Amino acid sequence: MTLILSKDRLAAYDSLEQYKENLKFISFITPKISNLEIYLRNALDYCLTQMKGSEWVFNENSLTPLIKELKEKKKEITHSLILSKMSLGAVINLIFCYKLEGVILDLRAYRFRAYYHENKDTLLIKGKKRLLYNYIKAHIALNLLWTIRNRAYHWENLLKIQPNNRPRIATPFSGKTENIPMDRILVIGIEPNKITLFLDDLIKSIENKDFEDLSSL
């Protein structure tokens, strides 16, 4: 078996059966992740086109390396081509850069505690609890989606938890990027058996029945 799978890869699983279950799980959530990527890419394009005009993709400094790479392949450089070749990381970073989190996702009706019982849906600021603003929820959710996507597409074990029984899918939020004077860092995690729920909630938050149907293939 080590001729096919490395020892390091096998060591990440309790058994070969868990490896197979993980592959099945990744194949199940892939349509959800893919459709969320498409939505985020198009939503970003819509917002930045409204803000900066349709030429924004050609003028965005962070996309210069991608455009150069496409030119080297002698492809006809179009708006739609650049957009389609952007990685999820590039899309999310631009969403963060232009502070579009709360515009693109409305997560006010959703609670992070649903994905792990120790998650907090409040911030502690100068000793007082404050409910998470929507843009903070969206910021955290996008980081979690990015983590899930990267681990799934590198065939990492999404069914595994940490030795201390905390989720391996987790992201911190310190408030520094938003100039929020938090008393302590907030860490939000997703248990393996809640990953599907998390992705479904992101999809439902977009409030488009056709989009939901496409994501449940």
Predicted region positions:
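Extended intrinsically disordered or low-complexity regions, especially N/C-terminal cytosolic tails and loops
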Residues: M1-I148, L159-L217
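Acidic/aromatic/glycine-rich contiguous surface patches that form carbohydrate-binding/processing clefts
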Residues: W155
